[in-house]
Structure formats: structure tokens, C-alpha cells
Amino acid sequence: MPITTTAQITNLQEKVIGAARLTLKDDQQPITQGFHIERANAGQDDTFNWPKLPGVTAFGLSEGVDMSSETIVDSNMSVSATEVGVAVEFTRKMLRTINSARFMRNMGSAMGSAVNVKKEQDTATLVDGFGNVIGLDGSPATIGQLSAGQTQLRANTEPLNSAMIGQLRAVVTPAMWHDLAQMLFPTGSGDSHAPMTAPPAEVASRTFSRYGPTGNYFGTPIFLSTNLVASGNNTRGGVWHPDAGLFYEFMPIDMYTDDSDKSLRSLEMGMVVDYGFGEANDGFGREWDADSTSPTS
């Protein structure tokens, strides 16, 4: 008996399309947010000046002997903002063939993600630029190295006081965290710079219930990023105080949608942000070098 199947009725079948998926980027900002951030107001210059006063020295005195005065000379660092942007262009005919409102929202999300990644990659060069280094290329990251960074910053020529030590942050790659996690939460064997005592049950439950750092190490939170500067299989992570660097946001994200060229019958969608960044105090940060080869066990 003749039968009709889906193989015969092809022109009446509706095409089924799900919601578009977005290509993900590591667009969180643990690096940028770790530095001192200044945001300009309307009417301000695109160059930010950050002056600094020197310290003075107290001396013992002898009765009846005049003490000598000191000359105060200030210093300054300046950061000039430059534009960073991303743009895409669509024909109006193409937009008419799709759900254009949803498409434009997705494009806005993708462009915002791209700007965040660019910020992170830029400020990662500040971490790579610290003059003092903990860790070693080709070797796994250790808790001892983080502890060394904390100690060096506390004893720096311009030392961080106890309150400032509480503002430190460390940023490492997922591979570096893999090595650190095995030291922070040991199974009972192997060398570790962390105490080998078993963590309380509630701490273990909270720690192992989610991926990544869940707290801090002696007051220093550990963040993960894949936007750190790399050199082969090695990565330039870091531990630093916010005042080690300055991020100046002259103009926040400005998004526009406009006719690119009427004769092209197209629409341009763009996003621009204006910022600058620079090192403020090299002694307030430590570059953390370590092997970041993807682990297999």
C-alpha cells in the first residue's frame, strides 16, 4: 500500500531553530578590579595625575641645639586614556530575516565581553611588569611562594601595614590553582607548606562543593584568570596591593547603533571605552611565575 512519509513532505515542514548560543570568553575582571580605579566625571581631562608626597625622617635631638629641616619634594605619575572599541555591521535585509531585537542583544553581550577581555589583557601586563618575582618558570605554583610574596610585601622598603596586607589579592591560572589546591587541602601524604591537619567537616564540604578558590590564604583571596600573560607553558600570575597600579576610566562603555552608509543599506553597531593604566608602585606587587601546563591528574 502506498504510504506518505517525511521523505515525501519536505516543503511544508517548518524549520526549528533554538535560541542562539554565545561563544564564551573569560570576561570576569579579577585583574583590572585588583588595581586602584579612578573614574572621570564629565568635564575632566583624559589624563589623570596621581601625586605622591615623600616621607620624612625623625632624629634624636640635643638640648639647645637647633634641629635641621627637610625639603619636601613631591612626585607624580600620570595616566592618559586611549580608546578601545569593537564594531560590527549588518545589512538591513539580513536583520529583517531574523529576530533582530534578540540578535542585537546577543551582539551587545558579545561586544561587552570582548571589551572586558581587552581590559584584562591590558592590565595583565602590569602584573607581568613587576620587578620582583616569586616562583619559577617550569615549576608548579606552591603555597610557599604565595606566603613569600605576602612576606616580601609586608617587609618592602615602603612596607604595607596590616590593614593594607588585608587588601592583597592573588590571581593565578586554573592550572596553577590545581597545584595550589592539592597543597591547601592535602589528602594526608606529600609535602605541603600548608598545615597537614584535616580541615573541619563544614570547611571541607564548602570547599569541595564548588570549583575554584572559596576563601583566602591568610587574608589573601586567590582569583582565577586565563587572561594572564603567558610565555610558552609558563604564566605570569601575581600577588599585589591595589595601589601597585592605576586604572583610569575616562569614559565608560558607550554603545551606539547608527546607519554606517545609507547607500550600503546597512546598520553599524559599535562599542567604545576610553581608559588608561600604569604602574604606580612596583614594590607593592610581585610577579608570580609558574608552569601552567594543563594537568592530567
Walk through the language-model features, giving the residues of each.
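Short, flexible loop/turn elements at secondary-structure junctions
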Residues: 54, 92-94, 172-176, 273
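Extended, low-charge hydrophobic alpha-helical regions
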Residues: 78-98
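Short, solvent-exposed loop/turn segments at the edges of secondary structure
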Residues: 81-85, 165, 264
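Assembly/oligomerization interface modules of large self-assembling protein complexes
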Residues: 21-84
